[in-house]
């Protein structure tokens, strides 16, 4: 914010964010990818309570004690005491799907019981990957004397690896948090897992979830967390958030971004900057528009 003229930086400068100084240097040398097939994969409105892979007679993958479950539930939501549905993301996915379809894109949408971690891991380099769900980041691991496990792993391992302390939440996650047993994925995608996705030819990843842009800073590699994970997986650009944002405003932001990018045929950065300014006109407080971040590789 510039106190001399009452304007914010985004109103005066074309701001560019990279994950690290190394990425900034490498970006000058990289060749631009030519995208010939417009494909998009959309995830949203997961059914956090439902997933057919859960059963009562299989091994426990993620056994959480009551104290840790309470900590998770409080930390993973946008404002409640449990992982609640995100009705705004259903409208968000529908609107984006309509916009993409009207511009000739091939779309695969996964919602409710289909918005699973396992379906995400099957994707292969779509041009756009959009995930509208809860995100999380643990800056501090809660202490407990009951056992030395956190998220089913040795606590010391989690503390030492920040890639295990941030992630996204998919269908069935509540059942994992309650300590139920699973035959497959648990609905909790860590940054470490996200880094293994096949996004080698993906132009844009949008993480429409709270706190997805946070991570642990290091001297040489920028921020360890979901932003680093998706860049490592191959994504060229990432749009994510730094704090909890109103569901409806998030939906408006994302829908407006796609409209500008596809209809006006702008660059991703120009579409993002214009979207921020448009949202700022309707919601002047930085809380609403300042949370969103574009990271370029």
Label every model-predicted segment:
Residues 1-297:
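Catalytic cores of enzymes
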């Amino acid at each position: 914010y510039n106190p001399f003229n009452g304007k914010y930086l985004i109103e005066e400068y074309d701001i560019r964010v990279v994950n690290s100084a190394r990425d900034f240097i490498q970006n000058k040398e990289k060749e631009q990818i030519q995208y010939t097939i417009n494909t998009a994969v959309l995830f949203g409105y997961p059914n956090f309570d439902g997933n057919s892979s859960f059963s009562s007679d299989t091994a426990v993958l993620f056994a959480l004690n009551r104290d840790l479950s309470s900590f998770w539930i409080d930390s993973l939501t946008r404002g409640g005491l449990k992982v609640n549905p995100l009705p705004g993301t259903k409208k968000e996915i529908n609107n984006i799907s309509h916009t993409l379809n009207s511009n000739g894109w091939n779309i695969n949408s996964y919602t409710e019981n289909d918005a699973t971690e396992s379906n995400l891991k099957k994707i292969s380099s779509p041009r756009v990957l959009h995930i509208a769900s809860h995100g999380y980041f643990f800056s501090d691991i809660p202490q407990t004397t009951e056992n030395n496990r956190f998220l089913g792993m040795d606590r010391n391992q989690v503390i030492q690896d920040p890639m295990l302390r941030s992630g996204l939440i998919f269908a069935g996650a509540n059942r994992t948090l309650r300590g139920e047993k699973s035959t497959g994925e648990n609905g909790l995608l860590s940054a470490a897992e996200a880094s293994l996705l096949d996004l080698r030819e993906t132009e844009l990843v949008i993480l429409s979830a709270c706190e997805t842009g946070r991570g642990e800073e290091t001297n040489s590699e920028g921020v360890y967390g979901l932003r680093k994970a998706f860049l490592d997986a191959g994504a060229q650009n990432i749009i994510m958030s730094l704090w909890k944002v109103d569901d409806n405003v998030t939906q408006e932001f994302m829908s407006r971004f796609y409209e500008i990018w596809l209809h006006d045929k702008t660059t991703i950065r120009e579409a993002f900057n214009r979207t921020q300014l448009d949202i700022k006109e309707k919601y002047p407080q930085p809380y609403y528009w300042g949370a969103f971040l574009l990271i370029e590789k």
